[in-house]
């Protein structure tokens, strides 16, 4: 019954610069382009003065308010999809330290104000929202009082949503083998991929289920193989290293480096470490053992 009933506002913060001197201007500019595109896309449904109202505002939170007010005047509601909400905030924490990061995520920081505006209109205009990010750190710092969302990161219902089961990987390889694109036995390729790409699990309640293969890595392997009919020389896709670089910087600047280094050493030597996964924690508490282990989990290690 709700099909085609809502407008969709999709936003991504992945391209916002993390230079503290340019960040807010980049954020406002990025949001302005998104809101302008939204107004043009739905021009036949919105009041004719909507775009003008949006462009008269200087900051993103005010532009969002203008959009929401226009929708409310027309009796319309929207779905908000916010992708990589924490990208530039995490970069600030890694590259510029906690003081700059705190000014962004606490008090009257522009990103915090933007999310406050989102909350203000959830009962009138924003019918549903879907927010994605890398780690729970920024969400904890940004959303005190943002008690309108539920964290689905470790919900067992979604455990199999992103990765591939081994049966799915095998089906993919068998398809290309039948097409004559793969000359190696499928079992041989599975044995190559399994130590590198298998054993992912996204919920403690799913530990007894079959583990998942990293879908990005599997597709990287298959794409490389189809080009050369040989497995890739480097089994790890370099495009997936960004989060590991962030983690390395976090460890280097952390005052408790020695303690957390032992956790990494434990993973290297024993293949695992045990802890309770935290749904969220503030940046100032990253060094606490369970928080640090949780960060490793969210970074996919």
Which role fits each region the language model picked out?
Residues 1-40:
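P-loop NTPase motor core
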Residues 66-73, 100-127:
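Substrate-engagement module of ASCE P-loop NTPases
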Residues 26-28, 94-102, 142-156, 219-236:
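Short secondary-structure boundary/capping segments
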Residues 14, 83-84, 113-139, 143-146:
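A short beta-strand-to-loop transition that corresponds to the Sensor-1 phosphate-sensing loop
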